[in-house]
Amino acid sequence: MGGLTALELAGYWQYAILGRRQLWIYSDSRRARSILERLSMTADPSLRSRKLFGGPELGVETRPLDLVTTTLGPATSSGSDAPTHNQMLRVSSLERAILEVLDEVPRTVGFEHAAQLFEGLTTLRPKLTSSLLESCRSVKAKRLFLYFAGQHSYAWVRAIKRTEIDLGSGKRQIVAGGRLDPEYNITVPAEGRPAQPRAAR
């Protein structure tokens, strides 16, 4: 599980998309697609590629899902025993999940929705976040991440070394009719706050 599903299971239900839920499942296996098509589920499984990152296992954790409360427990080793009412899941960490979400802006996730999700990410792990940004293959996702990070004064933001992140070249249209953010060369809502420039590290 990853993306928006991982964030919801981690407690970000208040930002869930209304209507029938999608399960963001990351796999490049043809067999996985065949199995999912045969399942009868109360949510729509949506299969996505794991090729967004150079390290397919980077930031993926084994965590217990409480089947009663539908909440995730802390990350654990894959061989750990879980209570009988728990199901062990391979799920994206918050750091990986938010980049998976940003890669789908504005295709399946709106800019404002992504901004709301980012507001709650107060405790990201700087080392893992930096590694994921360096491994991420989506220039758009990385630029959006750094743009949103510039809106907040979270402690982990100061540890991100922008000079080690490949942000590509050229402009990216994210919001049609928006203004161009000069720091990251992406279009953002005209009424939004400008990103606060930071000295390169």
Residue ranges and their predicted role:
Residues 2-7:
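Leucine-rich, amphipathic alpha-helical/linker segments
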Residues 8-201:
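Phosphate-handling catalytic interfaces
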